[in-house]
UniProtKB/Swiss-Prot annotation:
Record-annotated EngB-type G domain positions: 23-197
Upper classification of the organism: Bacteria, Pseudomonadati, Pseudomonadota, Gammaproteobacteria, Alteromonadales
Protein name per Swiss-Prot or TrEMBL: Probable GTP-binding protein EngB
Family listed: Belongs to the TRAFAC class TrmE-Era-EngA-EngB-Septin-like GTPase superfamily. EngB GTPase family.
Stored NCBIfam families: GTPase_YsxC
Gene (name only): engB
Length: 212
């Protein structure tokens, strides 16, 4: 069973100023309003309704926090960039996202979700630049990979990996599909590293071996 099935709703906040508990480790998920962020979180946690998927992109305006265990959290940041959202609201969200990435001490990793057919749009790039400037590792997750045939999917991945070099930071690119769970093991492996779960399992294994 995956560790991430333990996720449960912890709190919501309109912006970083209302977020408490800036201790422990947080990993944030961010993306354009139609990038499949909620679906990816639900797939990761094996929970159909942990993150609510909206048929109207741009409706999720709150920062939603899910707790895995004490001091370990997944953070669902507001979707951005949807055309029908008022400009003033867009600017408010962008400012809030930037502030969170630059000031949140417990943030140890950022997953930026992008439709594999349209990666690295302006706001995606802004988000990654902010993270790199704050020395936060980034996973650029190319979602909806099931929409492309294998050859085209690999070509898009190579193109995105090439583009990611320009950020001059710790930016990994991976393809993903919530529909067929393509890329899920790779996503979990990266999250395990950010949360320190790989070290924890190694330490537990060493203890067991020492007891033999």
């Amino acid at each position: 069973m995956s560790y991430y099935t333990k996720a449960k709703f912890f709190t919501s906040a309109p912006d970083i100023r209302h977020l408490k508990n800036d201790t422990g480790i947080e990993v944030a998920f961010a993306g354009r309003s139609n990038a499949g962020k909620s679906s990816a979180l639900n797939t990761l946690t094996r929970q159909r309704n942990l993150a609510r998927t909206s048929k109207t992109p741009g409706r999720t305006q709150l920062i939603n926090v899910f707790e895995l265990e004490e001091e370990l959290r997944l953070v669902d940041l507001p979707g951005y960039g949807f055309a029908k959202v008022p400009v003033a609201m867009k600017k408010k969200w962008q400012a809030s996202l930037g502030e969170y990435l630059q000031k949140r001490k417990s943030l140890k990793g950022l997953v930026v979700l992008m439709d594999i057919r349209h990666p690295f749009k302006d706001l995606d790039q802004d988000l990654i630049h902010w993270a790199v400037e704050s020395n936060i590792p980034v996973l650029a997750l190319l979602t909806k990979a099931d929409k492309l045939k294998s050859g085209k999917r690999k070509a898009q991945l190579l193109m995105a990996q090439e583009a990611a070099l320009a950020f001059m930071g710790d930016v990994t690119v991976q393809t993903f599909s919530s529909l067929n769970k393509h890329g899920l093991p790779e996503l979990e492996r990266i999250l395990d590293g950010w949360f320190g779960l790989d070290k924890k399992s190694d330490e537990e294994g060493a203890v067991v071996e020492g007891q033999d």
